[in-house]
């Protein structure tokens, strides 16, 4: 293909994403677009086609972004090449969304005709506007009995500033309005810029590991051309590789001769090491490199840390390999080795949020067959010590002694909640209970209010979202962003079993709630830890001070069962012997702690 043909082809390329709040019908719309452009044989069609992970189908959510090429015969007689990049909608996966958007020129904004605009919709719209994308608003599910398309149209105009006349009414499930959406994509989404003669610049927006072919990187070509046999250079590391295959996803991988300006496809270059193909890096040609890399993504820092330990210590190295492979296409995952007296060797792992953590844990157990114990998640605290030095703590067990600490800072987030009017009181009460600071409140219309609070991240990551949903009968939507670290009066609470500290059960809590939390946790542990042959005291302590205590009663064993009638001194002798045995057992006794006990730390509320 010569450059003239490449430029002509570029004019007919449209790169777009679909963005939406969870459950507004994004994956269904993607299915219909695939079906209507005849990209998938009818026999291969299944729901949520682009959600390739079993886990995604089971939970009905999109976790990983996916890119696919479609051909569309438009009414103007031209054939267009569409690259659809499917994105997740959950707040934990905002990073995946920002990666998808960096590879696009436009985005379809899907809004549920019954629910209207929700917090996550707005968050994704701002991301799209930051990337200077053209937006195509679609109101989905218009055939629902509760649908109010006219109200939602007005909302889109008032809150996002898009013209009502540009809104497409659709129902992905019933295949209504899909043809109109496809025509609008041609009209609204601009063709990509870029020069096929310039030095190659390709953005890696995703990558996965194949045991036979090495690393497969998903790329968007911004300038230049790449084909098999080219020697490429990674601009972040300077490492060079020879390209063995370039291709496109249709959704199956299909090798092609070359990828040129505006194309979205994949590249394989015998890259064996996960670290050599980092998401956000720029690929260029070794023989004619670009002068500067493309602007990558802002690195997402983990918000929540927890310890992952294999139940069988033999699996320690397998766990490392599993984490490395997952990290390849999940650049926000971080991990480092950690050891715990209670659990042996494992990894301290950083996640974007609780859903992200659950999913990584489930993927390790499913895809790699490693059984795990996870400790209670914790956020990152900054401690300024009395000697002026600073310490970062992501594991409560490593918190310095309170008398050495001058100040402790914890991360705060700005939380935006959209709530029906009737539940404003309940939501504000929940935020106050979670140490929130009221910022402002906006009445969006007669039905809904937008409430903004500043909250400590530690209170948000555990079960805030679940409680928000239950306090509003499931109607609230929620989004948060990190703002800053603020000074707080925090203490470390240790849990002692049989007089020994269990490092994996330590947690950090605000001093005002320490007593209630400690009391609630020891009572909870009493029910979760199985009874032993001896009595086990469970204590919660701050430093040297015990703030709560309870005992797990011993299992009774009747040593007198064989003693029929007979002498009282005989019975006494047996009882004394049992007592001595129990004392000895207690001195060396090891208490088995089930997985539920580690998670009990989370499930407490301050009530």
UniProtKB/Swiss-Prot annotation:
Keyword terms: Cell membrane, GTP-binding, Hydrolase, Membrane, Nucleotide-binding, Protein biosynthesis
Catalytic function, reaction form: GTP + H2O = GDP + phosphate + H(+)
GO cellular component terms attached to this protein's record: plasma membrane
MF (Gene Ontology): GTP binding; GTPase activity; ribosome binding; translation elongation factor activity
Pfam families in UniProt: EFG_C, GTP_EFTU, GTP_EFTU_D2, LepA_C
Any GO BP: positive regulation of translation
Membrane-crossing residue ranges in chain numbering: none
Family, as annotated: Belongs to the TRAFAC class translation factor GTPase superfamily. Classic translation factor GTPase family. LepA subfamily.
UniProt protein name: Elongation factor 4
Lineage: Bacteria, Bacillati, Bacillota, Bacilli, Bacillales
